[in-house]
Amino acid sequence: PFAYLSDKPKDMRKEFLSSIWRIRVGSVALPLQMIAGMKRGVFVAGKYSQRRHIFGPDQKPKPIISFRTQHGPILHALAQLSVFDAYAQHSIQYFKHPNVAAPVQHAIGAMLKAVLYKTSQACLFTLSERCGAQGLFENNHIIEAMLETRAMSIAEGDTLVLSIRMGPSFISFYVMY
């Protein structure tokens, strides 16, 4: 056996993984769209809750944002976004560090995806419910963000599979005594 363009690599798997380095970059970049979708959902649910009013016992209009069941999930999503923004920035900086090995870069992307996928799906579902039937309307973009999040979770494989694949890399990379 011989190679037409160069010598055959000693480790075919390592050669293959080094040739597809862009996948590691994408594994960090893609989940960032989930944060953008959550921000869009929070904005829409917040505006809807400020605009929609009901009449109280005193027959005065009251915005539904004043109810705990309405503002609670919106504030919870805002708190999550605050944490996710910081987590994403930290992950990006760590990913870009020149001394970080490829398996660790892959792990950073897989962890970011796993954390953001599960929480953004739950968050967007809750925000959609806070908007009633209007949460399902295409022009409000909440359901659209849920579908985009679902598509991104499928894009590089299920988070369980990514986590399982990541395990042997860490076991061989770090030796525990």
What residues fall within each predicted segment?
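Flavin-dependent oxidoreductase catalytic core characteristic
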Residues: P1-Y177
